[in-house]
């Protein structure tokens, strides 16, 4: 049996920070309220989004989640992004509905809630439940053409100014967090410099750093987005944009290194 240790992370820090492999035969458990231990379960990491209201809940969608992605220079279990939506299989959907019912009947939450889980042999193993707007939600919002904050407001009985349009055939959206491969300075020719910010239009970059700013190795640099008709196409687009950033930051050389 494999385990991981997890330290409670600061609020303003990347998801997945503080998670490390743990071998009880070689390491000693720390008696510290900031630490806890989880069994490591192999499988595909996924995210599910729920919206709870007075009468029950709605499963808004699921997506594939990645962490510790080496091509994005993410260490250990650092959050690396999401792709979706993905259609859950029947047993997965049944497990998610059961979990939603347990949460609803025992805790009576209202509004948006995200759950990270491992899908192993079509069985759901919950990892973390977050009663808030989570990093994977914008992927499903962009894919489905929906505003989840509208649903969140409605769950509290607040009438939103903006009503969600009818759902259309979803696109597939990919989101990836590019981490600094080494200490870098943001150059003037970064690919996002020429992009005019417009919240109504799909953009391939977000969380854009200021030109000339210094970012240390392992810290997030920028968020990459991709949009296509299939997961395969989305993966290809994200790979291409990641390679462009590797070239920009001279991965494999000492150029643009602050040290």
Task: Place the predicted regions along the sequence by residue.
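Peripheral (often C-terminal) accessory segments that flank ATP-dependent C-N-forming ligase machineries
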Residues: 153-259
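Short helix/loop capping segments that flank catalytic or ligand/cofactor-binding pockets
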Residues: 16-18, 60, 70-71, 137, ...
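ATP-grasp fold ATP-binding core
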Residues: 2-21, 33-49, 60-64, 115, ...
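ATP-dependent carboxylate/phosphate-activation module, predominantly the ATP-grasp catalytic core
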Residues: 39-102, 106-108, 130-156, 166-168
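Conserved metal-phosphate-binding beta-hairpin within the catalytic cores
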Residues: 104-138, 177-181
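Structural beta-strand/beta-sheet cores of well-ordered domains, especially the beta-sheet scaffolds
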Residues: 33, 46, 55-58, 111-115, ...
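Short acidic-glycine loop/turn motifs at beta-strand connectors
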Residues: 52-57, 119-123, 181, 228-229
């Amino acid at each position: 049996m494999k385990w991981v240790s997890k330290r409670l992370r600061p609020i303003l820090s990347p998801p997945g920070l503080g998670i490390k492999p743990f071998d009880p035969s070689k390491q000693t458990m720390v008696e510290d309220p900031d630490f806890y231990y989880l069994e490591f379960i192999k499988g595909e990491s996924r995210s599910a989004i729920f919206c709870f209201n007075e009468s029950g809940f709605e499963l808004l969608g699921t997506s594939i989640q990645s962490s510790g992605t080496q091509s994005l220079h993410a260490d250990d279990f650092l959050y690396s992004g999401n792709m979706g939506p993905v259609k859950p299989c029947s047993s997965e959907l049944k497990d998610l509905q059961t979990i939603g019912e347990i949460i609803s009947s025992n805790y009576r939450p209202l509004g948006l809630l995200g759950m990270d889980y491992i899908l192993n042999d079509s069985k759901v193993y919950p990892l973390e439940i977050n009663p808030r707007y989570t990093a994977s939600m914008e992927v499903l919002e962009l894919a489905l053409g929906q505003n989840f904050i509208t649903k969140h407001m409605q769950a509290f009985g607040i009438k939103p100014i903006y009503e969600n349009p009818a759902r259309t055939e979803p696109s597939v959206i990919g989101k990836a967090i590019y981490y600094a491969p080494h200490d870098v300075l943001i150059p003037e020719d970064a690919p996002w410099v020429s992009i005019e910010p417009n919240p109504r239009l799909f953009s391939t970059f977000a969380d854009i750093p200021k030109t000339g700013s210094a970012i240390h190795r392992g810290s997030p640099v920028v968020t990459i987005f991709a949009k296509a008709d299939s997961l395969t196409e989305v993966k290809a687009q994200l790979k291409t944009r990641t390679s462009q950033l590797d070239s920009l930051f001279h991965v494999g050389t000492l150029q643009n290194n602050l040290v």
